[in-house]
Amino acid sequence: MFKSIVCSVLAASLVNAGTIPLGKLADVAKIGTQEEIIPFLGGAGPYYSFPGDYGISRDLPEGCEMKQLQMVGRHGERYPTTSKAKTIKKTWYKLSNYTRQFNGSLTFLNDDYEFFITDDKNLEMESTFANSVDVLNPYTGEMDAKRHAREFLQQYGYMVENQTDFAVFTSNSERCHDTAQYFIDGLGDQFNISLQTISEAESSGANTLSACNSCPAWDYDVNDDILDEYDTTYLNDIANRLNKDNKGLNLTSDDASTLFDWCAYEVNVRGYSDVCDIFSKDELVRYSYGQDLETFYQQGPGYDIIKSVGSNLFNASVKLLKQSKTQAQNVWLSFTHDTDILNYLTTIGIIDDKNNLTAEYVPFMGNTFHRSWYVPQGARVYTEMFQCSNDTYVRYAINDAVIPIETCSTGPGFSCEINEFYDYAEKRVAGTDFLKVCNVSSVSNVTELTFFWDWNTTHYNATLLKQ
């Protein structure tokens, strides 16, 4: 199946692409060979399946029938943002203006290296067949979304066999919208899908997939005092090593940090990155945990505002589950950003909020939070609601792995009995108040998420934004 998808994507892209990104012959031996480092790139690199799957089968438990399916997905693999590209270019400027032969792990720059950001119009955008640096790149956001669609049909195709007309929802970020459209394309032309584009502007208030944007109370520097405790001398070690090998280069610890971003985004658009080979395995581990720390304390359980922000989408999800018997649509697919998914998972309780991460050292026992496990590019969180005999159950599948609710998993396939789930959900949102905690009224008078229910009459079509 995958081979046929590749062929169809290549054929369509060849028709639409003016210039084919052939890349260099040397790329052939390297492309797709660095998958072992992807989990250490903090979610900036390509999609991969959740490593801690507990061995639980993704199959529907025997004798059960799926009643409703929800999915919240992240946009696919992409180029860096404009701001991130600025820092990468700053480091590239130092390297490209170095007048001597490179030594050590930078020797690849002697071999007619082509910087991976060849056109600024690609910044912020999904990586595609047409805008990749190499035609053989297996990690494009375009291919990821289309492959996801085919895997969706293989896993859940029976859910849409008799429901060929339905809506798919996306934020109006262009890369999220593109991911949704590529996913729809991957489903095939047998479906009549209405793509609803929901604004992520702060004026949308609660009626959004991106509640964090409607939260003026959000403090982007929160918990910096904790994060500052983390030992980042490994970045100095990287810079010193490169400078020692290359006299007069004068890279800084900031440059060393930037090289990790360079590595991740180049893999997204070239299929591999020689920059990734600069780092030792220990350095990758230290960088990865630094990303975990930052996420935990600024986008996850370590920031007390997050549970309220995530409750906006979680409450809507629970409402859809409760209305499963009366809703004409039983598949709800949405595409947004990593921050929104992290907020959502925090409210659900999938991310452990009982034990704060330490900044004093890298913990190897008892640490269950790894940013890139939850939100690699192309991440997807499924909510499955199924009936077995006369009882109904709910469970979550994240990036191809069933992740049970630890305190409610005695049902078939480690699911949670529906009434127990509703009790659990009520406890999770107790004390949360998105509108009040975020001071939403200062930017919007929209107090409810309604697009799942009124899309057929409102027809959401927000202007696409390159962000």
Residue ranges and their predicted role:
Residues 1-21:
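Fungal secretory targeting signals
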Residues 18-167, 171-332, 336-467:
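Signature for phosphate-centric chemistry
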